[in-house]
Amino acid sequence: MKKQKVFIIAGPTASGKSGLALSLAEKIGGEIVNADAFQVYKGLQILTARPTPEEMHGIPHHLYGYADNDAQEDVAGWVQKAANVIPEIKNPIVVGGTGLYLSVLMNGLSPIPDVSPEIRKEVRLMDPKEVVAKLEKGTVPRDIQRQRRALEILLETGQPIEYFQNLPKKNYIDADFYPVVLLPPREKLYARIEKRLIQMLEQNVVEEVQKLLVSSASGGVMKAIGVRELIDFIEKRCDLQTAAEKILLSTRHYAKRQMTWFRHQMPSAKILKTPEVTDVITL
C-alpha cells in the first residue's frame, strides 16, 4: 500500500512559512496542520502570529488554539494529536518553526514514561541548584527546563533520562515526508521580524497580554517571546519602546537559533530562500 505523502514546511519565525503553506494548500487541495509550540494555545493569537479565520482563506487548519492557557502542552501530546489528524487528511501540509515537533513527527520519540502530577509539582517548586544537586545519575542538561525534566524522570522511575532516550524510538505515523525549510537571507528575515512586531503593536498586542495577565494564566503560553517584556511594560517597569526593543532582540536571537537547528537537524530538507510554491510542488 502506498504511503501517505506529507509536506513539511519549516523555517524560522517570520520567514513566510504560513503564506507558503496556504499557497500550497490552495494548489493541491491540501489542509494545514500546525507545528508551532505556542500557536497551540488559545491565548495570544496576535503575539504568536496564529492565523485568523480571515487569513485561513477557507482552507482547513488543524491543531491551532486547542490548548488552554493553563495547560503545559509538550511534544508528546502534540505528536499524538498530529498522528490522529494527519491520516484523515488527503493532502496534509505540516507547518511550523518548532523543530523538535517536526523531528519527532518524522523520526519518532523515545519512550519516556509519564510523570505523576505530584512529582512534577515537587520538581517545579525546587530551586535550580537543588535540581542539579539531585541529578546524581547521568549527565546534567544545560538549561533548567531540561534539568527539571531529567529529574522528574529520575524520581519517577529510578532511571536517568538517557536510559529511555537510548531505547528504540516510537514512530507515530507511517508516511513519506517531503520537508522544505525556508531560510531567507538574514537581513530580509530581520526586516520581516521588525515589520511583524510593528504590526502586532498596532493590533493591540499589549491589550492581549494584559488580558492573559488578568486571567492568571500559568501554562506554556506564558513562555512565548514578548510576554515577559510586555508584562514589564504593563507593570511600569519599562516604557513601551524598551519592551519592543527587547522583543525584537529576543526574536532575532530565536530566529538565529532556529536557522542553525534546521540546517543541522534536517539535512534532507530542500532549502528555499524565497517561498515559491512551485519549488514545493515539484518535490
Predicted features, each with a name:
Residues 1-283:
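Phosphate/pyrophosphate-binding catalytic cores of soluble transferases and nucleic-acid-acting enzymes
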